[in-house]
Curated annotation (Swiss-Prot):
Gene3D superfamilies: 6.10.250.620, Radical SAM ThiC family, central domain. The lineage of its organism: Archaea, Methanobacteriati, Methanobacteriota, Stenosarchaea group, Methanomicrobia. Pathway: Cofactor biosynthesis; thiamine diphosphate biosynthesis. It comes from the Archaea. This is Phosphomethylpyrimidine synthase. Its cofactor is [4Fe-4S] cluster. It catalyses: 5-amino-1-(5-phospho-beta-D-ribosyl)imidazole + S-adenosyl-L-methionine = 4-amino-2-methyl-5-(phosphooxymethyl)pyrimidine + CO + 5'-deoxyadenosine + formate + L-methionine + 3 H(+). The gene is thiC.
Amino acid sequence: MSLIEDARRGVVTEEMRIVAAAEGVTEDFVRRGVAEGHIVIPVSPYRRVKICGIGEGLRTKVNASIGTSTDMVDVDMEVEKVRQAERAGADTLMELSTGGDFLEIRRRVVEATTLSVGSVPLYQAFIEAARKRGAVVHMEPDDLFRITAEQAKLGTNFMAIHTGINYETMKRLQNQGRHGGLVSRGGAFMTAWMLHNEKENPLYSEFDYLLEILKEHEVTLSFGNGMRAGAVHDATDRAQVQELLINAELADKAHEQGVQTIIEGPGHIPVDEIQTNVVLQKRVTNRRPFYMLGPLVTDIAPGYDDRVAAIGAALSSSYGADFICYVTPAEHLALPTPEEVYEGVMSSRIAAHVGDMIKLKKRDADLEMGHARRDLDWERQFAVAMNPERARAIRDERMPADTDGCTMCGDYCALKIVGRHFNF
């Protein structure tokens, strides 16, 4: 019996109770959200997972993606990225390796954390085809489905699956063209395979079989956005919207079959199109959880893309996005270091909180900080801060002569001056 089927029968499971307690909502609110497909709770029958609810009415969650590349294969470094992501407060991880021993890397990552771990089975299937048969276009569909099941058994409990790339989607892309090209690795692999083999995407044509595998292993299906824009000038184009419509229809089918679903969204969107994208996604998918990569709101700030994405993520969250994939300062430049993973998670967590201040009216912590600053209560300020360690380190490094204030104002602290005359 899947979580959705339990929820439909009126059963409040332990996972639902945990989410309700963590989010400050009723157990029945969570149960109804799961039953209707507005909330997902990734679980795994193969390992202990820290329970995390994603969706409508819940705090915006942050994912940290890690993984090797063909140029950098260091499993110990990837495990350290897991630690840094957890230290920074990530809610979930995705393991997206494209180099090295896939089984060993994923096993080490899964063993290093209790967070939900996502994957993209398509990567492994295509790259193994290239290693064994000389090119990604020689991937065998049976291998793709086998790898999906194997990754689930290892403890991967949500998966990005590129079902929305089919002949109709490709036609839209070919007819329209793009300024920034096709930047999704999964989208590129599948498009190349389809064109070379003159066959439909097996994840689309054999979707019923895919659902059987995912349901058997209680995997949450995250519909991949293989046609997402890689430049702001391509945002909200026909190929992106076509893929969304296909994924929306398939999500209905998956939900009917008892498979939890998330819809992934675009990665580069100008500020004035973010609300349009969130509203469109929520409308056509029947309010399923929306997972945004960033989004990045400008293309000209490499080295600072964690900040660029935080702007987009804050707005996306405020309009109703439920799940944010972090972006690191190394985006578009290099594989991130553990330190950059930490920075990326922190930037996205700040953005998620800013969005929740609007979407959920969650402002109690900000009120507490305002009072602590008014009272020059530094310990309270550190306790409320999203990163107490960093805040304390900066202050300790530049401690003022008068320890009530700080070195920004020194003797002329506005709060101390006014405090002599007002009792706020």
